[in-house]
């Protein structure tokens, strides 16, 4: 092994130098592919395929980091691992992006035609796939690119067709006329979960609907007067006495001068508004149901682009919102508008284009969901089919959605996607559904619509493994997959659909565990979004701090299922942690002497610090294994941090210096082995989270194997268990910290020798402190060191209480008593003034109402800090006044 020098391991951690080129080395070494070891247990994850709509955001970075930790850890635990990458064509989202780009060039998709437009989308896909690949590489994701899939691949298209055809033949896919959510900009139907509801300003328009016999009118309140031309009835509740004698009579529909009946239906809420509602079966899902019950005509008044059609009379050709204004003006002119009542109400908007969604009568393809949902709900009671949600509470979210499910509209009026495998006979209108086109294709026309993106995504865990070929090697070896990692926001969109499709077509759960994480928010707790301009590009963070620091932040700041707030301060703290590891690694490696092969520590050579170190390492390994198995990566990170910083760096490395710089060659050789082994183990433990830096450092240590990526994971060793050493070192460290704390308060530097008196309440500590005095004294620099149960408390002494003892350090020789009292009195007064100043702000209602929430929170934090400082200062002053 080449000796460590400034050339082989730089004096200072430089994340750019460490990470540059390392990913390509891993790819060249082929370490991300499955091992192929048939004796090893398989473990597989399929990546939630990112949309090819653009660059990956911080949520993707979080999601994929969690997956990478799982797969890297399982790989070095000895599993035959597969992490399968891929991307989603994202039908409406990608098409909307490309159409927006074309609009800037003054072109529409209709100008190009379907074939040329789809080619443009493929070009977009290729461009952003390269971007995503680059981002995956920067993140250090250990993906097997030889198995990468795309949701429009030929193989996946075969799976999609197979599922569609089978569900159709089973009577679970049907085509029918129904009210759907309609996006007028994308000109396509949307499922309920593709609609986002926002509070918008609107109005209740109170309109007179005159009786046909001229005897008066009924008052109707509507938020959507533009749909009036599609009204076919007015409905009242059967028990509403106000209208009992009116049921069956006719009204004149304003503006249309068409007669419509008054009907009674239990759907109407008699307490809401006037208790009478207009029924528009072609423009409202509830009205559609009422219309079916009463055999009402369905009059669609809108085109697919949101303009009014021929059924809208003189308003034909107007945009829907222009038509609203025109109709309201005409109603007012005709004396039929009673009043306009401003309101704020929840209005559905397209998730992708942002436009207001229309409820529109349309012929679409649907999946009959009840039988599929019932089977999936039942499977949660069967141990071999149950999907375990982590955290468990999200199983309720999943089941609640499944129990209240509606039929799923799966057709989309788009050009980018899986075209529906249905053909209509040009002469007879007969429908044919099949894997292949009819042989006499000249007599048939294929349905122009494509399938909802989520239809193909729902098949992702098994379609990527070669299904419907159940003899495909990957399907047989790696399906069902083991763990899905995803956000709670797409449990209904994606998780639920993968489960019911997996159960229906493979008769197995698609994954055993689904690890749910929250949303990535900004430092103020707001969801990151384009509209707020608060999104953070993970590549910018990597440029400044490195992928390892970002990855460490992403897993240590939260628990499963919780949202997390992005914090540059915490990413910087992660970088500082890595820098600490770098520094102790350099120290260890530059003090290994001629040790050039890895060796096992020999417990027979251990001093107390060695026994303690390896007992702590053993416990850390056990905790990490337990926490990672439960996906508690945040707690796992804190456990690793504690060992690395508080055990190895702060104490053991410092303890080792006396031996390493001494003359006992045998002791030095043993200490080198112990340092190298401990560092090797912690690098292996940290590698799944921070692969770049720990891969680099591990290669500089004595090692076997070509890469830390495939190096075996640490295993707890019972020979290292030592409760006595742990309790002894805990007491010694507490003693050292206690003395240091007294020194700090007294302003006495370590170079100044002090008397130390330790009064014991636990006599068992006496031999521990006395036998390890030489070691303790290196950290406390005592002039005299007295330990016993009968030690008297000296006057004017600083003190600290630890488990089993009280420490005293006489201060009379260290400080000027009067000068220190004066200083503390002055400090206390200044702190009281600061607290009073903040209280004045916090008691000012003007400040509280106008200042940003973050500013108010900062003032409260400052006040709390000042309170703590004041308490400490007063306690110190009281201590000196008693002396």
Swiss-Prot record:
It is an enzyme of class 6 (ligase). It comes from Lacticaseibacillus casei (Lactobacillus casei). Residues 811-883 form a coiled coil. It is found in: Cytoplasm. InterPro entries: aa-tRNA-synth_I_CS, aa-tRNA-synth_Ia, Anticodon_Ia_Val, M/V/L/I-tRNA-synth_anticd-bd, Rossmann-like_a/b/a_fold, tRNA-bd_arm, tRNAsynth_Ia_anticodon-bd, Val-tRNA_synth_C_sf. Its main location: cytoplasm. It catalyses: tRNA(Val) + L-valine + ATP = L-valyl-tRNA(Val) + AMP + diphosphate. This is Valine--tRNA ligase. One of its GO terms (cellular component) is cytosol. A motif ('HIGH' region) lies at residues 50-60. A motif ('KMSKS' region) lies at residues 527-531. CDD domains: Anticodon_Ia_Val, ValRS_core. Monomer. The keyword GTP-binding does not apply. ValRS has two distinct active sites: one for aminoacylation and one for editing. The misactivated threonine is translocated from the active site to the editing site. Residues 859-883 are annotated as: Disordered. The gene is valS. Belongs to the class-I aminoacyl-tRNA synthetase family. ValS type 1 subfamily. GO terms for molecular function: aminoacyl-tRNA deacylase activity; ATP binding; valine-tRNA ligase activity. Keywords: Aminoacyl-tRNA synthetase, ATP-binding, Coiled coil, Cytoplasm, Ligase, Nucleotide-binding, Protein biosynthesis. ATP binds at residue 530. The lineage of its organism: Bacteria, Bacillati, Bacillota, Bacilli, Lactobacillales. Pfam families: Anticodon_1, tRNA-synt_1, Val_tRNA-synt_C. SUPFAM superfamilies: Anticodon-binding domain of a subclass of class I aminoacyl-tRNA synthetases (SSF47323), Nucleotidylyl transferase (SSF52374), tRNA-binding arm (SSF46589), ValRS/IleRS/LeuRS editing domain (SSF50677). Its EC number is 6.1.1.9. Catalyzes the attachment of valine to tRNA(Val). As ValRS can inadvertently accommodate and process structurally similar amino acids such as threonine, to avoid such errors, it has a 'posttransfer' editing activity that hydrolyzes mischarged Thr-tRNA(Val) in a tRNA-dependent manner.
């Amino acid at each position: 092994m080449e000796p460590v020098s400034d050339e082989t391991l730089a004096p200072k951690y430089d994340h750019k130098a460490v990470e540059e080129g390392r990913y390509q080395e891993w790819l060249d070494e082929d370490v991300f592919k499955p091992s192929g070891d048939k004796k090893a247990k398989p473990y597989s994850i399929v990546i939630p395929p990112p949309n090819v709509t653009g660059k990956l955001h911080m949520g993707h970075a979080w999601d994929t980091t969690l997956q990478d930790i799982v797969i890297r850890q399982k790989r070095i635990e000895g599993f035959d691992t597969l992490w399968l990458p891929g991307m989603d064509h994202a039908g409406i989202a990608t098409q909307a992006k490309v159409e927006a780009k074309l609009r800037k060039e003054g072109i529409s998709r209709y100008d190009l035609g379907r074939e040329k437009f789809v080619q443009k989308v493929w070009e977009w896909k290729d461009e952003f796939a390269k971007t995503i690949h680059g981002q995956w590489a920067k993140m250090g994701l250990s993906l097997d690119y030889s198995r990468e899939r795309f949701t429009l691949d030929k193989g996946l298209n075969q799976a999609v067709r197979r599922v569609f055809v089978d569900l159709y033949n089973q009577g679970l896919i049907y085509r029918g006329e129904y009210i759907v959510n309609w996006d007028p900009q994308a000109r396509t139907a949307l499922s309920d979960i593709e609609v986002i509801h926002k509070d918008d300003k609107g109005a209740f328009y109170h309109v007179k609907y005159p009786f046909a016999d001229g005897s008066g009118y009924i008052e109707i309140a509507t938020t959507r007067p533009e749909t009036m031309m599609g009204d076919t009835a007015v409905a009242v509740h059967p028990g509403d006495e106000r209208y009992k004698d009116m049921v069956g009579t006719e009204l004149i529909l304003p503006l249309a001068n068409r007669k419509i009946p008054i009907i009674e239906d239990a759907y109407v809420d008699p307490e809401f508004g006037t208790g009478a509602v207009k029924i528009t079966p072609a423009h409202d899902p509830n009205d559609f149901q009422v219309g079916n019950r009463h055999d009402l005509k369905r009059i669609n008044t809108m085109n697919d682009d949101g303009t009014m059609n021929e059924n809208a009379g003189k308003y034909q050709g107007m945009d829907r919102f222009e038509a609203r204004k025109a109709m309201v003006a005409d109603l007012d002119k005709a004396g039929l508008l009673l009043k306009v009542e401003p309101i704020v109400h929840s209005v559905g908007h397209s998730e992708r284009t942002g436009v207001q969604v229309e409820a529109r009568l349309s012929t679409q393809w649907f999946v009959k969901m009840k039988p599929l949902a019932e089977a999936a709900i039942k499977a949660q009671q069967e141990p071999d089919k149950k999907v375990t949600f982590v955290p468990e509470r999200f199983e309720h979210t999943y089941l609640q959605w499944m129990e209240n499910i509606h039929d799923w509209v799966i057709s989309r009026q788009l050009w980018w996607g899986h075209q529906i495998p249905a053909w209509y006979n040009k002469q007879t209108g007969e429908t044919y559904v099949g894997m292949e086109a009819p042989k006499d294709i000249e007599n048939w026309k294929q349905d122009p619509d494509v399938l909802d993106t989520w239809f193909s995504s729902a098949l992702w865990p098994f379609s990527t493994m070669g299904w419907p070929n159940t003899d495909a090697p990957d399907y047989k070896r790696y399906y069902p997959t083991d763990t899905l990692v995803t956000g709670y926001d797409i449990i209904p969109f994606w998780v639920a659909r993968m489960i019911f499709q997996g159960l229906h077509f493979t008769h197995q759960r698609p994954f055993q565990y689904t690890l749910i994480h929250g949303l990535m928010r900004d430092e103020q707790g707001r969801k990151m979004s384009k509209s707020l301009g608060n999104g953070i590009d993970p590549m910018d963070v990597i440029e400044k701090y490195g992928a390892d620091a970002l990855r460490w932040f992403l897993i240590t700041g939260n628990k499963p299922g919780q949202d997390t707030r992005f914090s540059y301060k915490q990413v910087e703290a992660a970088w500082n942690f890595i820098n600490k590891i770098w520094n102790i690694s350099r120290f260890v490696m530059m003090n290994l002497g001629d040790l050039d092969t890895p060796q096992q520590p020999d417990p027979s050579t251990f001093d107390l610090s060695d026994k303690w170190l390896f007992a702590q390492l053993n416990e850390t390994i056990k905790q990490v294994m337990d926490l990672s198995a439960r996906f508690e990566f945040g707690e796992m990170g804190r456990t690793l941090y504690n060992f690395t910083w508080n055990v190895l760096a702060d104490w053991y490395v410092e303890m080792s210096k006396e031996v390493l710089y001494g003359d006992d060659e045998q002791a030095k050789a043993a200490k080198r082995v112990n340092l190298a082994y401990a560092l090797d183990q912690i690098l292996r433990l940290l590698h799944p989270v921070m692969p770049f830096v720990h891969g680099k450092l591990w290669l500089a240590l004595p090692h076997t194997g070509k890469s830390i990526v495939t190096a075996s994971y640490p295993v707890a060793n019972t020979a290292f268990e030592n409760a006595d050493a742990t309790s002894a070192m805990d007491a010694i460290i507490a003693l050292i910290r206690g003395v240091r704390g007294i020194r700090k308060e007294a302003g006495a530097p370590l170079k100044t020798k002090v008397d130390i008196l330790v009064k014991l309440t636990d006599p068992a500590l006496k031999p521990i402190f006395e036998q390890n005095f030489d070691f303790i004294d290196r950290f406390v620099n005592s002039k005299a060191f007295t330990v016993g149960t009968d030690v008297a408390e000296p006057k004017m002494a600083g003190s600290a209480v630890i488990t089993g003892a009280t420490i005293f350090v006489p201060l009379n020789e260290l400080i000027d008593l009067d000068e220190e009292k004066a200083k503390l009195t002055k400090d206390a007064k200044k702190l009281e003034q600061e607290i009073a100043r903040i209280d004045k702000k916090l008691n000012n209602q003007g400040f509280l109402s106008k200042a940003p929430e973050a500013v108010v929170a900062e003032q409260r934090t400052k006040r709390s800090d000042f309170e703590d400082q004041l308490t400490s200062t007063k306690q110190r002053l009281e201590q000196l006044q008693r002396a």
